[in-house]
């Protein structure tokens, strides 16, 4: 194993030992502008759990008044002097849903609504981390490629912190998400091509002009931001973990981060059980799940799903994602676009949670897994909704339908509702 420029005396990260390549094991000092290993592998942040256990307890956390992702600073790779980012990211609600649990034959079911974050998606957790690390690196410009949510989250978090942004999106990105970028003042490049072509263009620009890289599979710190969703779930459940945790999967960064957070908590003794992960992908694009189901290395796939945020045919964080699913003895579940839209409507009508298609893919997978007997009766499950439904209104209308459109006539209203099997009494 090669060790590159490791000097714990000089690093400002007292809780971090190093960054280690998940492919070859090479280690690097955890400097702010880390990217991939020289072998092309993805880096993983390695923590000093003895140091963390000496400085971080459940009692410390219980007494901490900070309802954001930064309440877990001891488990995050940021310098002590780095300020919390301006937007209030994290500490999203975890709703218990007994009605839906009964419908699915589950013992208990919780829905984590990360669509309430500042730019309406879980990606705010990664972007807040990117802003913090860009601050440490002394950067002025942050850039990324994205199918939508990472872009809007970077644009918003960077705007609040005073950074300039360049954001590359495939031209199929929903207009609602692109509108967010423009409102936040991002310099937006709509690329005539798929996500892979968009990613390559962003990588070339970042290398050419030296911008801070917010691309999740290149920057190892971003999954550390995303892992805070699992830290919150554990704390909100009073450290009693469910049997399963379901989440939608695109490039693999989120599910990898979720698993990293759970392992961190297990390593410091905050939890004594690790849930099995449910990796949810669309049948229109499921390269990570296919690798699990066929027990072979992942291969690129075409991108053909309404769940745009997880429509990633070449997942850049596949190595970490596959490790997470396999280590957790997880389940890979593919769902159709029709099942995704049905889950969107089901969540809205039973739980009052409005998620975008990619955001509810985890719930669609839970439903399908229950129906197929992959999840046992009476099991406990957390399903994470990763993005708000207002980001993609066109598909929400496909799911829920149009309102009745009539003249101002109550009798006509009753008549039209009757055609839909709805009464006014």
Q: What do these predicted ranges mean?
A:
Residues 2-3:
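Generic short N-terminal amphipathic or hydrophobic helices
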